[in-house]
Regions:
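Membrane-proximal, lumen/periplasm-facing interface regions of secretory-pathway glyco-
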Residues: 366-397, 411-413, 505-509, 533-536, ...
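An acidic, glycine-rich "communication" segment
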Residues: 601-662
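A glycine-centered loop/beta-turn motif at secondary-structure junctions
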Residues: 653-710
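Short alpha-beta junction capping motif
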Residues: 565-604, 677-679
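Short acidic, glycine/proline-enriched helix-loop-strand junctions
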Residues: 480-512
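Membrane-embedded transmembrane-helix bundle of lipid-linked glycan/lipid transferases
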Residues: 1-381, 390-393, 472, 486, ...
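Active-site-proximal, structured, solvent-exposed surfaces of multi-pass membrane proteins
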Residues: 531-532, 712-815
């Protein structure tokens, strides 16, 4: 007992030392996402003080966001609790969080060590676990606090999986289920990674031990039910249209050469933001595979397979698998290390000299990463650091003049810290951007703002800031290649839209527009774009309205006939003939319709991209287009940019009047022209995308001719005052004008007392008082899933308990028979 108390005391001391060193480090809270989690915890803490146990909506980020819906809520509650323990100080709460995670993670290993009769080794692993280089990376570089919380119970999960599979201990099944539920509610994506790692372990188990597969089936069922038990939250999280990235490109970033994962000096030469498996850990894994007893070998093999899967040579293989977008293999490193350490813990035949050497290597491997904890030790406080950031980026001044919402275009270079500074609980203002964009209903809107900044579509950028309700804007300028010309273009575009430059420094320009305190926007567009890639034309021609729905059957003739031009690219339909009839009717009555042939859907009946009597056929160009013979003259467009030299596009058959053609292999290929009448225009060769990439003036003139639009024209916008009040479960909006864009993002938890309409992911209301009530999304469906999962879980536990009891009786019977036989022999 005294030994246990001593170990617990040592763990507590280590945790306090960690808290102290971090508090004096001068760089805390570090980590790209840390401030995002601190912000959420602080918002929840304030809500809890006001009696709101589950904030449905936070208006401060992304024009309003459901912060508890798309990111697992357990870490948010945990951080709110830590903030309460710190007396309401969110940064003190962060230190408490680190201390608790360090302490509880260590305690998990100690409990496991005691259970296996190896309390000293378990205590050492517990003291080491938080300081493993990859775990420190997650906490202090990535700022992934939810994953850090998962690390607390991961060893217990591995222990119970091993116990159920190898020891056939029934009580381990409920425990591993509960561990998995906890991890799912901490970080659903990471729980999925743990489940995939478990599949590897199960495969190794099946090959090594050749036992009944029923135990594996039970564990996998427990994992599946663990996911489903969280259905009351998980169903709504998956149902609400959460935006995802180009997953294959993101996935590629989480593979690296094997030697990079094993280079212990890389952290000293390239910084600490590198994934490191650990040379010592790899030596342990290889040593275990070669010399460990069969009972403790499975974890070593699992760790080795995971390590191999982190290498770049495996990317081309894994990317072909279904669900590969979730295989961010470098994120699996801590899981692999946990399996390896657990196998070492239960390897009770290993000679002490070897064990001591391995432990020394593991400890030495952590030393370079410890700087992540103690930093510069200059004692700079978070408040001082944030104040310096706010002054250097002009955020402080921008907040002081913001009436409604502030837009900071930083391309995430400042991480979540800038988002916290803008909307901090003390003196924050509402922001167009935020942190954790995957939870934003306006994810597409802000993505286009970033893209327009990168592509120098400044007129579009400032105009859409107005649409999003931003009266103040901060734009970085230090990365401009041609400072004089670029800054002049930026200022001119801002002035055209109505912004005035208030201040500037070497890094940022600050713009502001005089507006009513709280305002909405009434807008008239000349044109409308429909389809997944229609926004490209909007960036080049800001007077083209973006839309949310790509389905032509969602629109009416009356709705589209109000526009001078309708642009279609990447559109869909449910009823092809109805869509074609509507488009043809529009053109016959004076509306110009321009269709990008590359974005025409494939006809399911013919397997060909066809629409309104035309069909499109694939063609590839290398490096650049051939000579383009058009009604505007012969064009010689710019070459394709680097990375786009293999240009996959289409040409068009069936045009009545060909306005543009190119010759390829002695064949004339139409890429531009009309069908049926001069208002129905088709464009091929993916010229819109080419223009977005190159800004080729020749192509721009062609597109302007086709669209009959001026690239410098803006939509007609009128700012109108609104009275907006946010409550715990409702938003009250008072407007004196009809069809007002409130600049509040649209969510499926909204129900209005009078009709509300979504346009481009933003809420539009009518004249009068609109009360939008909010309710927990998909409560009945989610609760039903959790209830069914709970019943099935109990059934699984009961069935496995009966199986265990039967096996126990059989074992007791065998033992009793042996004892009787021995007595008879005597």
């Amino acid at each position: 007992m005294l030994g246990c108390l001593l170990v617990i005391g040592i763990y507590a001391a280590i945790s306090f030392v960690v808290m102290y060193l971090v508090s004096r480090s001068g760089v805390y809270p570090s980590g790209s996402d840390t401030m995002c989690h601190i912000y959420k915890g602080s918002v929840l803490y304030q809500a809890l003080k006001n009696g709101n146990w589950y904030p449905l909506f936070d208006p401060m980020w992304y024009n309003g966001v459901e912060m508890m819906r798309y990111w697992a809520p357990m870490p948010v509650y945990f951080l709110a609790m830590c903030q309460a323990l710190a007396g309401g100080d969110c940064f003190g709460g962060y230190l408490v969080f680190l201390g608790i995670v360090s302490f509880l993670g260590a305690l998990s290993w100690f409990v496991i060590g005691r259970r296996h009769g190896r309390p000293v080794l378990g205590a050492i692993f517990g003291a080491l676990w938080f300081f493993m280089p990859n775990n420190l990376l997650a906490v202090f570089v990535e700022g992934n606090l939810p994953r850090a919380l998962c690390m607390v119970v991961l060893p217990l999960f591995v222990e119970n999986v091993h116990d159920y599979l190898l020891e056939q201990r029934w009580s381990s099944l409920p425990k591993l289920t509960l561990c998995f539920v906890f991890m799912t509610m901490c970080h659903t994506g990471y729980a999925g990674m743990i489940a995939l790692a478990l599949l590897i372990f199960a495969a190794v188990y099946a090959i090594l031990y050749r036992k009944s597969l029923w135990s594996i089936v039970h564990v996998l069922l427990a994992i599946i039910l663990g996911f489903l038990l969280t259905g009351i939250w998980l169903y709504a999280s998956l149902k609400g249209g959460i935006t995802s990235t180009d997953s294959s490109q993101v996935m590629r970033q989480f593979f690296q050469e094997a030697w990079l994962s094993l280079d212990p000096l890389r952290r000293l030469t390239q910084g600490f933001d590198v994934f490191y498996f650990g040379l010592a850990a790899f030596i342990l894994v290889i040593f275990g595979i070669l010399f460990a007893k069969k009972r403790s070998m499975a974890g070593f093999w699992t760790a080795f397979i995971i390590f191999i899967c982190t290498t770049t040579m495996m990317y081309d293989v894994l990317v072909l698998l279904p669900g590969s977008q979730y295989l961010w293999m470098l994120r699996f490193i801590s899981i692999a290390l946990c399996f390896a350490l657990y196998s070492l813990l239960i390897w009770n035949t290993l000679k002490k000299p070897f064990l001591v050497v391995i432990l020394l290597l593991l400890v030495l491997d952590t030393v370079p990463s410890l700087q992540l904890i103690y930093g510069t030790m200059d004692g700079t406080t978070p408040a001082q650091r944030l104040e310096q950031l706010e002054e250097g980026t002009l955020i402080a001044e921008a907040k002081s003049i913001t009436s409604q919402r502030l837009a900071l275009i930083d391309l995430s270079t400042l991480g979540a810290t800038a988002a916290y500074c803008i909307s901090d609980p003390e003196d924050g203002v509402m922001a167009t951007f935020g942190a954790g964009w995957q939870s934003a209903a306006t994810a597409m809107n802000i993505s286009r703002l970033n893209e327009s900044y990168e592509n120098m579509n400044y007129l579009y950028m400032f105009d859409r800031m107005v649409e999003l309700g931003s009266d103040t804007a901060l734009v970085p300028v230090s990365n401009f290649t041609n400072q004089t010309d670029d800054l002049l273009q930026l200022d001119e575009a801002a002035k055209r839209v109505g912004y005035e430059r208030i201040d500037s420094n070497e890094g940022y320009y600050l713009y502001h527009m005089d507006t009513p305190g709280s305002f909405g926007v009434c807008t008239t567009y000349d044109a409308i774009g429909i389809g997944t890639s229609a926004s490209l034309i909007s960036m080049a021609f800001p007077s083209v309205e973006e839309t949310s729905s790509t389905n032509l059957n969602d629109y009416t003739y009356e709705e589209l006939s109000r526009y001078h031009t309708v642009y279609l690219s990447g559109f869909t339909y449910d009823q092809k003939k109805e869509a074609e009839d509507m488009i043809l009717k529009l053109t016959e009555n004076g509306t110009r319709v321009v269709i990008l042939a590359d974005g025409i859907p494939v006809d399911t009946a013919t397997g060909i991209q066809s629409f309104l009597g035309t069909d499109s056929h694939n063609i590839n160009f290398k490096n650049g287009y051939p000579e383009l013979d058009t009604i505007d003259g012969v064009l010689h467009p710019d070459l394709f940019p680097s990375g786009y030299t293999d240009w996959k596009t289409v040409y068009i058959n069936g045009l009545d009047d060909v306005w543009g053609a190119a010759t390829d292999l002695d064949q004339s290929l139409g890429f531009y022209g009309t069908k049926y009448n001069e208002n129905l225009i088709f464009i091929g060769f993916n010229l819109t995308y080419h223009y977005a990439l190159t800004k080729d003036q020749q192509v721009g003139v062609l597109l302007a001719h086709a669209l009959d639009l001026d690239a410098n024209a803006l939509p007609e916008r009128t700012l109108v005052p609104l009275d907006v009040t946010y409550g715990a479960d409702r938003i009250t909006i008072v407007s004196d004008t009809d069809d007002v864009n409130t600049t509040i993002s649209d969510h499926d938890i909204f129900t209005g007392n009078q009709p509300i309409e979504e346009k481009n992911h933003l809420i539009h209301v009518s004249k009068g008082t609109t009360v939008i009530t909010m309710s927990y999304p998909y409560l009945k469906e989610g609760a039903l899933i959790s209830l069914i999962a709970a019943i099935l879980t109990v059934c699984l536990w009961a069935a496995t308990w009966k199986r265990a009891q039967k096996r126990k009786k059989e074992t007791e019977s065998i033992i009793k028979n042996r004892e009787n036989n021995n007595l008879n022999r005597r």
